[in-house]
Amino acid sequence: MANQVIRCKAAVAWEAGKPLSIEEIEVAPPKAHEVRIKILATAVCHTDAYTLSGADPEGCFPVILGHEGAGIVESVGEGVTKLKAGDTVIPLYIPQCGECKFCLNPKTNLCQKIRVTQGKGLMPDGTSRFTCKGKSVFHFMGTSTFSEYTVVADISVAKIDPSAPLDKVCLLGCGISTGYGAAVNTAKVEPGSTCAVFGLGGVGLAVIMGCKVAGASRIIGIDINKDKFAKAKEFGASECISPQDFSKSIQEVLVEMTDGGVDYSFECIGNVKVMRSALEAAHKGWGVSVVVGVAASGEEISTRPFQLVTGRTWKGTAFGGWKSVESVPKLVSEYMSKKIKVDEFVTGNLSFDQINQAFDLMHSGDSIRTVLKM
């Protein structure tokens, strides 16, 4: 099948705001420096829902969404040397070419090699590998895992341990890696420190896990949904609070609880007002606040400059700061050796045909991650 078009099932988003439609699509063979992957498991993430809602200015339709997946290489295009058919892989929405100035700088993981075409929903040569009913269908985040087969750039693939369970490690393609890395890479949480985590969804739980692994002595979880508190404590939160239980601002509450503020705070929602609260809950002189959640396009953050003048640091993170191709295999190994949790993030499994139900579960707040088995 290597040089053949493959016909398979995919969940196509024909237009914004409508449920996904399971369709038969054609997936063209990989061109030079591309890899065609048989996806075996994929999860549903808020970023998929954000684009589907129509709020994403980079959103193009029709499109095949999905960016938390895992599978097996079916075939490779010309010039691909590091991957071969049969390899077990995780597609990556942040590539690692190893050559651009971003890849060569140890301070960042934001490879820019294919950023422009990826943002337009196209492969690096400016075209799509997907067609459905005679129409070209856009790619998404360079991954498009809501399809039985997908084509990705060879710099957007992590080769992983073939014994890893794909219906679990697919989550390392986004949420878990993002939250865990926000704590250990971006904030560089220190042993004995105090942390506050705003938003206790999948990413927030991964931040808590990262703070715990880094040796934080006190981790405060913050969410308006108290149903999430028990799970947060399982992951390592020392205590959990809801802003709705207090008459004063949540930052004032935290400053009082912690004798001046926390050493590290993390915003895992994408709400600019909460980002401000997280910064202002950080300790004067040394507190660090990390923006992990992605706010809607056009939103702006604000605080009084005095907050920064008096020694607080405001940072942001994408994919937890991990250089993707080299780091994801290591994260899989950390999971296999039980250093990090993954299974505990999976709150349910559904068949691929039930993908819209997985979105409903996510919106209800009742699930952390639902994994679809292809």
Curated annotation (Swiss-Prot):
Q: Which InterPro entries match?
A: ADH-like_C (IPR013149), ADH-like_N (IPR013154), ADH_3 (IPR014183), ADH_Zn_CS (IPR002328), GroES-like_sf (IPR011032), NAD(P)-bd_dom_sf (IPR036291)
Keyword Acetylation annotated: yes
Output the Gene Ontology terms for molecular function.
Answer: alcohol dehydrogenase (NAD+) activity; fatty acid binding; formaldehyde dehydrogenase (NAD+) activity; identical protein binding; S-(hydroxymethyl)glutathione dehydrogenase (NAD+) activity; S-(hydroxymethyl)glutathione dehydrogenase (NADP+) activity; S-(hydroxymethyl)glutathione dehydrogenase [NAD(P)+] activity; S-nitrosoglutathione reductase (NADH) activity
User: Which keywords accompany this UniProt record?
Assistant: Acetylation, Cytoplasm, Lipid metabolism, Metal-binding, NAD, Oxidoreductase, Phosphoprotein, Zinc
Q: Which domain of life is it from?
A: Eukaryota
Judged by the first EC level, this protein's enzyme class is oxidoreductase
Modified sites of kind Phosphoserine: S247, S324, S351
Which cofactors go with this protein? Zn(2+)
Q: Which Pfam families match?
A: ADH_N, ADH_zinc_N
Annotated binding of Zn(2+) 2, by residue:
C97, C100, C103, C111
Tissue expression pattern: Ubiquitous.
Q: Which reaction does it catalyse?
A: a primary alcohol + NAD(+) = an aldehyde + NADH + H(+); a secondary alcohol + NAD(+) = a ketone + NADH + H(+); S-(hydroxymethyl)glutathione + NADP(+) = S-formylglutathione + NADPH + H(+); S-(hydroxymethyl)glutathione + NAD(+) = S-formylglutathione + NADH + H(+)
> Which residues carry the post-translational modification N-acetylalanine, per the record?
A2
Q: Decide whether keyword Lipid metabolism is in the record.
A: yes
Residue(s) carrying N6-succinyllysine: K233, K315
GO biological processes: fatty acid omega-oxidation; formaldehyde catabolic process; positive regulation of blood pressure; respiratory system process; response to lipopolysaccharide; response to nitrosative stress; response to redox state; retinoid metabolic process
Q: Where in the cell is it found?
A: Cytoplasm
Instruction: State how the cofactor is bound.
Output: Binds 2 Zn(2+) ions per subunit.
PROSITE patterns registered for this protein in UniProt = ADH_ZINC
A single GO cellular-component term from the record reads:
mitochondrion
What the record says about disrupting the gene is: Mice develop normally but show a significant increase in whole-cell S-nitrosylation. Mice display increased tissue damage and mortality following endotoxic or bacterial challenge.
- Function comment: Catalyzes the oxidation of long-chain primary alcohols and the oxidation of S-(hydroxymethyl) glutathione. Also oxidizes long chain omega-hydroxy fatty acids, such as 20-HETE, producing both the intermediate aldehyde, 20-oxoarachidonate and the end product, a dicarboxylic acid, (5Z,8Z,11Z,14Z)-eicosatetraenedioate. Class-III ADH is remarkably ineffective in oxidizing ethanol. Required for clearance of cellular formaldehyde, a cytotoxic and carcinogenic metabolite that induces DNA damage.
**How is the subunit organization of this protein annotated in UniProt?**
Homodimer.
UniProt similarity note:
Belongs to the zinc-containing alcohol dehydrogenase family. Class-III subfamily.
What is the official name of this protein in its record? Answer: Alcohol dehydrogenase class-3
- Identify the species of origin: Mus musculus (Mouse)
